[in-house]
């Protein structure tokens, strides 16, 4: 347990360091150096890393089952602490929300499914999913949209990253009826949070060796709100002369993503635009079932699918594609500095897709979720072996 305590101490030290928000998601290499290990070798501990698991709604529980089965087969040293929070299954309450928050604050790392938000207004404008992200200050959502070898789509060899500010903007939950039949919805944009997400995007590009950041906005219409966001991006860009900076209006960005997505590298944008672009870009490489995502605060990391879709119509039919969730789980292991297990699982998933014999319906095949899980387990082997 001493080794585990040492790694946790190092992680907390990194979190407490100056400007932690920009580097929390990128700290695994620092931990690796501090623990004096060879690259690709896991921390050998007597216990397991505690991780909060939130299955969510729709096919979320089925996808989490896939994660648990693959982790078990790969002997991953992770212990899941499972909680349930659902507005559609009447499993949501202030008490349950506090239990989830307590677990996530203790463990610092979580893997979650989509918590579906009902459209009906029941007296509370902020959904439990939104409240969870706000309370943990999960300001940066990162979605890596990358083509999977062996799976042909309209655009191949695509590799771009979408970074979304997800604690303000249109998701402020500030709505009211100013007069009968007239609803006002407030969009909140602050200099502090706009600068923070811009710096996160440029730090990410620097760390990952990417050459360009594109700020997506609608400042031609929302001159003050999006104007402030764009101004902050421009100011931060000046601090990174080696990174090319471009700006693009959101509607043009949507068209350009469909026509020529290869022009993009890292895109940074406010909340609502990010939600839309995440899903649009996922469709370029195969859909919601194949794109992983993650969200970061200065202290916490949450791993999830890139396109948050509950896929309710597939519940119980054993047809959901676990690719996105398994790749997200692999990213979580890398965040925990479990490089060996992370690579082993990611390579197994990619091998199954490349071979092409086992594919779920969304990928044009007839295989079940169970078939896919078994095939991934069958392709597990020590990375590099």
Curated annotation (Swiss-Prot):
Q: Where in the cell is it found?
A: Mitochondrion
Provide any one GO MF term from the record: NAD binding
| Keyword Mitochondrion carried by entry | yes
Activity regulation remarks: The heterotetramer and the heterodimer composed of IDH3A and IDH3G subunits can be allosterically activated by citrate (CIT) or/and ADP, and the two activators can act independently or synergistically. The heterodimer composed of IDH3A and IDH3B subunits cannot be allosterically regulated and the allosteric regulation of the heterotetramer is through the IDH3G subunit and not the IDH3B subunit.
Quote the SUPFAM superfamilies the UniProt record gives.
Isocitrate/Isopropylmalate dehydrogenase-like
The transit peptide of this chain lies at 1-33
Kindly give the PROSITE patterns that the UniProt entry links to this protein: IDH_IMDH (PS00470)
UniProt-listed GO biological process terms: isocitrate metabolic process; tricarboxylic acid cycle
Tissue-level expression reads: Isoform A is predominant in heart muscle; also found in brain, kidney and liver. Isoform B is present in kidney and liver.
SMART domains associated with the record: Iso_dh
Q: Does the keyword Mitochondrion apply?
A: yes
Q: Which keywords does UniProt give here?
A: Acetylation, Mitochondrion, Transit peptide, Tricarboxylic acid cycle
Q: How does it assemble?
A: Heterooligomer of subunits alpha (IDH3A), beta (IDH3B), and gamma (IDH3G) in the apparent ratio of 2:1:1. The heterodimer containing one IDH3A and one IDH3B subunit and the heterodimer containing one IDH3A and one IDH3G subunit assemble into a heterotetramer (which contains two subunits of IDH3A, one of IDH3B and one of IDH3G) and further into the heterooctamer.
What role does it play? Plays a structural role to facilitate the assembly and ensure the full activity of the enzyme catalyzing the decarboxylation of isocitrate (ICT) into alpha-ketoglutarate. The heterodimer composed of the alpha (IDH3A) and beta (IDH3B) subunits and the heterodimer composed of the alpha (IDH3A) and gamma (IDH3G) subunits, have considerable basal activity but the full activity of the heterotetramer (containing two subunits of IDH3A, one of IDH3B and one of IDH3G) requires the assembly and cooperative function of both heterodimers.
Under the heading PANTHER family, the entry gives: DECARBOXYLATING DEHYDROGENASES-ISOCITRATE, ISOPROPYLMALATE, TARTRATE, ISOCITRATE DEHYDROGENASE [NAD] SUBUNIT BETA, MITOCHONDRIAL
Family per record:
Belongs to the isocitrate and isopropylmalate dehydrogenases family.
| Protein's recorded name | Isocitrate dehydrogenase [NAD] subunit beta, mitochondrial
Organism, as annotated? Bos taurus
């Amino acid at each position: 347990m001493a080794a585990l305590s040492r790694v946790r101490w190092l992680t907390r030290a990194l979190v407490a360091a100056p400007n932690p928000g920009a580097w929390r998601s990128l700290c695994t290499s620092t931990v690796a150096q501090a623990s004096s290990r060879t690259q690709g070798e896991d921390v050998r501990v007597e216990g397991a890393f505690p991780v909060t698991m939130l299955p969510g709604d729709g096919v979320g529980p089925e996808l989490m089952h896939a994660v648990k089965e693959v982790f078990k087969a790969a002997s991953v040293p992770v212990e899941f602490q499972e909680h349930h929070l659902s507005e559609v299954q009447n499993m949501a309450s202030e008490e349950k929300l506090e239990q989830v928050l307590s677990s996530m604050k203790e463990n610092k790392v979580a893997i979650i499914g989509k918590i579906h938000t009902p459209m009906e207004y029941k007296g509370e404008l902020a959904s439990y999913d939104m409240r969870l992200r706000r309370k943990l200050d999960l300001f940066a959502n990162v979605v890596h949209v990358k083509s999977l070898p062996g799976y042909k789509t309209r655009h191949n060899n695509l590799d771009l990253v979408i970074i979304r500010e997800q604690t303000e903007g249109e998701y402020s939950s500030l709505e009211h009826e100013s007069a009968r039949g007239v609803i006002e919805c407030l969009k909140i944009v602050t200099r502090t949070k706009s600068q923070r997400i811009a710096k996160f995007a440029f730090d990410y590009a620097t760390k990952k060796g990417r050459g360009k950041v594109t700020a997506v906005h609608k400042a031609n219409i929302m001159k003050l709100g999006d104007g402030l966001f764009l101004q902050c991006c421009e100011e931060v860009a000046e601090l990174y002369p080696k990174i090319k900076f471009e700006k693009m209006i959101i509607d043009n960005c949507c068209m350009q993503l469909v026509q020529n997505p290869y022009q993009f590298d890292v895109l940074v944008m406010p909340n609502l635009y990010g939600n839309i672009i995440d899903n649009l870009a996922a469709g370029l490489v195969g859909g919601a079932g194949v794109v992983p995502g993650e969200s970061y605060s200065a202290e916490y990391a949450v791993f999830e699918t890139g396109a948050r879709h509950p896929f309710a119509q597939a519940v119980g039919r054993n047809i959901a594609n676990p690719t996105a969730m398994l790749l997200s789980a692999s990213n979580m292991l890398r965040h925990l500095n479990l490089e060996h297990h992370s690579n082993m699982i990611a390579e197994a998933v990619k091998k199954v897709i490349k071979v092409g014999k086992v594919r779920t319906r969304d990928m044009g095949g007839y295989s079940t979720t169970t078939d896919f899980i078994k095939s991934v387990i069958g392709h597990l082997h020590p990375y590099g072996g």
